[in-house]
Amino acid sequence: MATISAKLVKELREKTGAGMMDCKKALTETDGDIDKAIDYLREKGIAKAAKKADRIAAEGLVHVETKGNDAVIVEINSETDFVARNAGFQELVKEIANQVLDTKAETVEALMETTLPNGKSVDERIKEAISTIGEKLSVRRFAIRTKTDNDAFGAYLHMGGRIGVLTVVEGSTDEEAARDVAMHIAAINPKYVSSEQVSEEEINHEREVLKQQALNEGKPENIVEKMVEGRLRKYLQEICAVDQDFVKNPDVTVEAFLKTKGGKLVDFVRYEVGEGMEKREENFADEVKGQMK
């Protein structure tokens, strides 16, 4: 049997919101497999589906820059929130975003080797900023998107760049509508544009979890299938942007809202600073000790 560490229990708690003892039991029952433990908790009705990359720790900024039919969303990390609010750091983030658009670099590694207008490489510029600011800084990721003259980009930054979203709306040049949808995505955090992007494997997995959940609730087998399909539709609505109730007008879906503008959401990228990165250890040992008293 696998040893269940306090760190593993903590990770499961952060992903599911379930209690410490429930998480420990789930990990014990699944031999320390965190993905199976999440399913175990959900089947028992203890936890909801874990959100994608919901462990937020690192500081920094997300920025969106557009130039004609090209746009980029970039995340650059710092060690503290104080530096993220620094005007010099904010200028650096914009400078790097523009460099991505100018060079069309495909990877962070390739970007670091490109030359800025002043003759220095991006790598040298970052090191220079580290020396000036006094903190470790790093370009974490970026994504470039393109459109035609008949389409629109939507750019939205939340909390000064803590969350950033870039949307691509096809068939409409209404940038305000595209931005409104970007705001919706920042708030609701869907995983996909539409259900067409959800893999059959994920749907089958979710269907099985929902089936076990219904059976564990004591529902008769003859109605379980109907219940599962209903809950599956709700699940898809929760993770697919176009099927969600639009945050600025819950009477219509995102798809219906854009249809009134003659447009259709075809792509989006949502970055949240530090998502998926390790959290700092904060009093978890004290919490464990408290449970043992």
From Swiss-Prot:
InterPro entries for this protein: EF-Ts_dimer_sf (IPR036402), Transl_elong_EFTs/EF1B (IPR001816), Transl_elong_EFTs/EF1B_dimer (IPR014039), Transl_elong_Ts_CS (IPR018101), UBA-like_sf (IPR009060)
Similarity field: Belongs to the EF-Ts family.
PANTHER family: ELONGATION FACTOR TS, ELONGATION FACTOR TS, MITOCHONDRIAL
Role: Associates with the EF-Tu.GDP complex and induces the exchange of GDP to GTP. It remains bound to the aminoacyl-tRNA.EF-Tu.GTP complex up to the GTP hydrolysis stage on the ribosome.
Organism, scientific name: Staphylococcus aureus (strain Newman)
Keyword Ligase: no
GO molecular function: translation elongation factor activity
SUPFAM superfamilies: Elongation factor Ts (EF-Ts), dimerisation domain (SSF54713), UBA-like (SSF46934)
Keywords: Cytoplasm, Elongation factor, Protein biosynthesis
Region described as Involved in Mg(2+) ion dislocation from EF-Tu: 80-83
Domain of life from the UniProt record: Bacteria
Protein name per its UniProtKB record: Elongation factor Ts
A Gene Ontology cellular-component term: cytoplasm
